[in-house]
């Protein structure tokens, strides 16, 4: 055996590792431009994340609002379909029932008014403070009442002795007990008490 060959085997193996680690290099760019580029990229990413979060929040709040409105109008059977009487006795709430009409709750006077979409008449109904009807129940009641339009109805302000053809609005009656909201909704339309 040749001694020279043993020396070759005793040498350390060649180093195949990479050279010293250097910074991220962009050719032809000075250091201050690299830093500026990194700052701009970080700011853009932060803005994209914030805008995305805001848009998701807006979408979720819109879906939540639509779900609550859908449940209150024609929603799930497990939800409570009654409106609670507000702490404020002078609160008025107005709802549009699709294209069929407008419902107005007057919690101070405990009245519910309904004006159909064509706007030829206005229905008024008294509500009990412990049992305020839901929009769905009111819509059903008013639709049933409209379907039975051949039945005689009592105009508000008419007495039993007056004929059905007399104009009740020109009789000089005071409708202040209805309140400003109901008077504004119904205007000069004939009022029917249900």
From Swiss-Prot:
Domain BRICHOS residue range list: 95-194
InterPro entries reported in the protein's UniProt record: BRICHOS_dom, SP-C, SP-C_palmitoylation_site, Surfactant_protein_propep
GO molecular function per UniProt: identical protein binding
Region (Disordered): 1-21, 149-170
Cleaved propeptide residues: 1-23, 59-194
Location(s) in or outside the cell: Secreted, Extracellular space, Surface film
Chain residues carrying a lipid of type S-palmitoyl cysteine: 28-29
Biological processes per GO annotation: cellular response to mechanical stimulus; cellular response to nitric oxide; circadian rhythm; respiratory gaseous exchange by respiratory system; response to cAMP; response to glucocorticoid; response to glucose; response to growth factor
Top-rank taxon: Eukaryota
Matching PROSITE patterns: BRICHOS, SURFACT_PALMITOYL
Keyword annotations: Disulfide bond, Gaseous exchange, Lipoprotein, Palmitate, Secreted, Surface film
Disulfide bonds: 122-186
GO terms under cellular component: alveolar lamellar body; cytoplasm; extracellular region; extracellular space; multivesicular body
Keyword Protein biosynthesis set for record: no
Primary localization class, coarse: secreted
Its biological purpose: Pulmonary surfactant associated proteins promote alveolar stability by lowering the surface tension at the air-liquid interface in the peripheral air spaces.
Additional free-text comment from the UniProt record: Pulmonary surfactant consists of 90% lipid and 10% protein. There are 4 surfactant-associated proteins: 2 collagenous, carbohydrate-binding glycoproteins (SP-A and SP-D) and 2 small hydrophobic proteins (SP-B and SP-C).
Name recorded for this polypeptide: Surfactant protein C
Gene: Sftpc
